Amino acid sequence: MLLDLNRFSFPVFLKEVRLLTTLALPMLLAQVAQVGIGFVDTVMAGGAGKEDLAAVALGSSAFATVYITFMGIMAALNPMIAQLYGAGKTDEVGETGRQGIWFGLFLGVFGMVLMWAAITPFRNWLTLSDYVEGTMAQYMLFTSLAMPAAMVHRALHAYTSSLNRPRLIMLVSFAAFVLNVPLNYIFVYGKFGMPALGGAGCGLATMAVFWFSALALWIYIAKENFFRPFGLTAKFGKPDWAVFKQIWKIGAPIGLSYFLEASAFSFIVFLIAPFGEDYVAAQQVGISLSGILYMIPQSVGSAGTVRIGFSLGRREFSRARYISGVSLVLGWMLAVITVLSLVLFRSPLVSMYNNDPAVLSIAATVLLFAGLFQPADFTQCIASYALRGYKVTKVPMFIHAAAFWGCGLLPGYLLAYRFNMGIYGFWTALIASLTIAAIALVWCLELCSREMVRSHKAV
């Protein structure tokens, strides 16, 4: 049977579901809070006007592409730390965490410079109003300053989640979400003596909450008794290029996979810009809601990575394979709920963002397409995270490259412009690309986990 789902009794299945849920739920709440920051940005910008909403859509797409790609690179720390923890190598856990912070800081500075360099080419390429382009440039400038803190936060995020302590991440994320609301209100609308920055104010608020999140999570770890034996904050460690090389070897394919998937969504915003601001605004609504729902498989997948990595560290290879299957089943059950939510409540969901009739009509149709790809999206996400627990990252990268670019973005462009399907051509191609990725990744997971069990039985 697929991933030996019939290997253990039903009580064992329920136990694994419970363990995955215990890990995934705080991660989900933390992810929802983080995506909620983007949701607040979208709502606040929409309140300032559809020009500001379009500017934030463009600017946040650029920021999200860099952030998500680099977040994928930092995700290498999860299987590294989880396997060390499972093997009982306490000192190595703390040292790997320290090197992760150094790596994240260097990566974040590079991301900041990269975003600065991208502002002028984006403005030269776009053909929108001066106000939209200027607001987008300001937004990108502010959010670029968040990149160093964002990557340090991701290192600390990986450290705490891999040690089965996701509750700290949840608490910090909710505090950041709460802080983001008044900051957006102040900066966007010009309250308490501050100038009204419009959509650019969303970027300034985002920068502030990322720095808050990194600092708060560091303080939590330093003061929590559970973390003291690992010694993350007990001493200062110099950068170790050998560890950096290991992080890069595992993380670079993950980062590229994230980029390929994110670009299939983010680049669409730029490609549909010639259709007008209504379509750009509607696309931002679809991306925002899809991003919120994507946190569900991402959280289940993250929990699966930790549980699989921990089991492999303990040399429980059959258990790791079984956990891979259980995480997929849990994801499929949750996917049914998200499909129904998007289809049945698409109109009220869209109205939370903007009341412009044209935007409402386009966005409501976009959500139908988003609902159709939920099962495939859940499957490919959780399967890729499970493979990550095995430190298998290159094959998923190639699968994502073929699926999202070969079967997604490029065909979507042809459907949109050559076959006159407009924005819906891109979403049609995305459904096909996600389905192909899901099938290929599950097949890869089946082979990889089976071979791991067989090879260690033979020893």
Curated annotation (Swiss-Prot):
GO terms for cellular component: plasma membrane. The keyword Transmembrane helix applies. The keyword Glycoprotein does not apply. It comes from the Bacteria. InterPro entries: MATE_fam, MATE_MdtK, MdtK-like. The chain crosses the membrane at residues 20-40, 53-73, 100-120, 132-152, 168-188, 202-222, 254-274, 286-306, 325-345, 358-378, 395-415, 423-443. GO terms for biological process: monoatomic ion transport. Keywords: Antiport, Cell inner membrane, Cell membrane, Ion transport, Membrane, Transmembrane, Transmembrane helix, Transport. Multidrug efflux pump. This is Probable multidrug resistance protein NorM. It comes from Neisseria meningitidis serogroup B (strain ATCC BAA-335 / MC58). The gene is norM.
